[in-house]
Curated annotation (Swiss-Prot):
Induction: Up-regulated by USF1. Up-regulated by FOXO1. Residues 1-38 are annotated as: Disordered. Keywords: Developmental protein. InterPro entries: NEDD4-bd_p2, P-loop_NTPase. This is NEDD4-binding protein 2-like 1. Interacts with dynactin subunit proteins, including DCTN4, DCTN5 and DCTN5. SUPFAM superfamilies: P-loop containing nucleoside triphosphate hydrolases. It comes from Homo sapiens. Might play a role in adipocyte differentiation and triglyceride accumulation.
Length: 243
């Protein structure tokens, strides 16, 4: 009986099961799923926060920590060459498209990290950047200022540098979307033009802030979709090298 047992044992294969039976290949990830975290080598920081909450200070700190970082803000569109800030809500959508174009160019050139310094109240406002990140293999990192007053309307009205009134900041706070994720941003839907116009009107600065009244008052660099000197320009806190 012992000999029979040894013969049966000898016929058993000690090879791993995967060599006896061919394994099925793993299923591909669902379409629109970003690569696994370990595969990311480039980073996109999407800053969020109400006016005066400390976004620009946070952007500068990130740039200090990552000297190669580039900061892109839609606000840059409304800075004149002499450094004066003049806001025109009629060109807000164009300004966002202009900023997205700069960010896309930087991503295609492999710049990392890239920092988007915008209010980004709604998930859909960040969607173009999330799509770019997916297409160019960037990890998206959402950051908000960690200031104690970031939702204190009275303090925000006092601190913001563009003259946004307390009432408008209060309305912005009411619409602020919390707990956004990459997937919620990627699948967010852009609202109708009517709702966007309402948001645009709520973004108007207070009466003591300067703004352009007509397209003809824009500097030529704006009319042609960019700065006169495309090679380099300065903004608050850094140089963007033409992006």
């Amino acid at each position: 009986m012992e000999d029979s047992f040894l013969q049966s044992f000898g016929r058993l294969s000690l090879q791993p099961q995967q060599q006896q039976q061919r394994q099925r290949p793993p299923r591909p990830p669902p379409r629109g799923t970003p690569p696994r975290r370990h595969s990311f080598r480039k980073h996109l920081y999407l800053l969020r926060g109400l006016p005066g909450s400390g976004k620009t200070t946070l952007a500068r700190q990130l740039q200090h920590d990552f000297p190669r970082a580039l900061i892109f803000s839609t606000d840059d569109f409304f800075f004149r060459e002499d450094g004066a800030y003049e806001f025109n809500p009629d060109f807000l959508e164009e300004a966002h498209e202009w900023n997205q174009k700069r960010a896309r160019k930087a991503m295609r050139n492999g710049i990392s990290p890239i920092i988007i310094d915008n209010t980004n109240l709604h998930a859909w406002e960040m969607k173009p950047y999330a799509v770019m990140a997916l297409e160019n293999n960037y990890e998206v990192i959402f950051r908000e200022p960690d200031t104690r007053w970031k939702f204190n309307v009275q303090e925000l009205a006092r601190r913001n540098i563009h003259g946004v009134s307390r009432e408008k900041i209060h309305r912005m706070k009411e619409r602020y979307e919390h707990d956004v994720t990459f997937h919620s941003v990627l699948h967010a839907e852009k609202p109708s033009r009517m709702n966007r116009n309402q948001d645009r009107n709520n973004a108007l600065p207070s009466n003591n802030a300067r703004y352009w009244n007509s397209y003809t008052e824009f500097p030529n660099r704006r009319a042609h979709g960019g700065f006169t000197n495309e090679s380099s320009y300065h903004r608050r806190g850094g140089c963007h090298h033409g992006y």
